[in-house]
Regions:
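Conserved AMP-binding A3 loop
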Residues: 108-112, 250-271
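Flexible, non-catalytic linker and terminal segments flanking ANL/adenylate-forming cores
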Residues: 2-83
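Conserved ATP-dependent adenylate/AMP-binding module captured primarily in the ANL superfamily
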Residues: 150, 167-197
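Conserved AMP-binding/adenylate-forming core of the ANL superfamily
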Residues: 94-129, 134-151, 168-173, 270
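Structured binding elements
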Residues: 157
């Protein structure tokens, strides 16, 4: 066991008997930021911060300082969405990650299933688009499949643009043109109506999330989209979670202004 892990486990012993010293905690933080350590050690340190007595200790000293330093850890060790979800899947496996609700029916999505679905989506996206820079649009009511696409993009480094369902057809066209979306996921009746109104002005690959089959233009079903991923064995995605530029724009979210053109707000893995 390396020296840093020894320090973490010694600190954990103190945490469990409520004898943790703030200086020990801060010195460990400084070591993590000054050295290059393995990710498992960093996860072990971050786990310490979940204990209520540690959280109180931080709050009693300088919580703003710690918030900034934890942000530095995220950047230094490239803890983007994909890395964190993969770590959670390895740790929690068959424990619930999400619960979907349809009327009175509830469906539990485990961490393993969520991660496997994300990997399949990434394979499918790479198969459907040969563009150098893949830009994903999501025009859909809230549902598991649209959330899956969003998380997949954040995990594997595709830019994603969620489009408000209350957009006008003019605003939809504006967003499609400005962001240069090359794959658009459409889900729900309202989304289909919006797209069909502007389809003739855009040449975009469409994925019919809910298999509505009334979408105009060149569309494929969700099942066919997943089949593309099943046939794509070029990359082992679990061993090739990409290192991402944490400041690169991962998401552009648009306001749905009633008069002027929608405004895009950019987000990266940090904010």
């Amino acid at each position: 066991m390396n020296d840093i892990k020894n320090k973490i486990f010694k600190l954990l012993d103190k945490v469990e008997i409520d004898k943790v010293d703030y200086n020990d905690l801060e010195n460990l933080l400084k070591t993590i930021l000054s050295e290059d350590l393995d990710q498992e050690s960093i996860y072990a340190f971050l786990d310490l911060l979940h204990f209520s007595n540690v959280s109180k200790l931080i709050a009693d000293n300088d919580s703003n300082y710690w918030a900034l330093k934890i942000s530095d850890i995220i950047k230094k060790y490239n803890f983007h969405t994909g890395q964190l979800l993969f770590q959670r899947a390895k740790r929690y496996k068959e424990k619930p990650a999400l619960i979907t609700i349809d009327g009175e029916n509830k469906k539990i999505i485990t961490y393993n299933k969520l991660w496997n679905d994300l990997v399949l989506c990434a394979k499918s996206i790479n198969s459907i688009s040969k563009d150098k820079e893949i830009k994903i649009g999501v025009l859909s009511a809230n549902q598991y499949k649209s959330a899956l696409i969003d998380l997949c993009c954040l995990s594997f480094g595709y830019r994603v643009i969620p489009i408000p369902l209350n957009s006008t057809s003019e605003h939809l066209s504006y967003i499609l043109n400005e962001t240069e979306i090359n794959v658009l996921f459409i889900g729900g009746e309202k989304a289909v109506q919006l797209w069909n109104a502007v389809q003739k002005y855009h040449n975009i690959k469409i994925v019919d999330i809910n298999d509505i089959r009334r979408i105009k233009g060149n569309s494929i079903s969700w099942e066919y989209f997943q089949d593309l991923g099943e046939k794509n064995n070029n990359i082992n995605y679990e061993l090739n979670i990409p290192i991402q530029d944490m400041k690169w724009t991962t998401t552009i979210m648009y306001t749905s202004g009633s008069t002027s053109n929608p405004k895009g707000v950019k987000f990266n893995q940090i904010m």
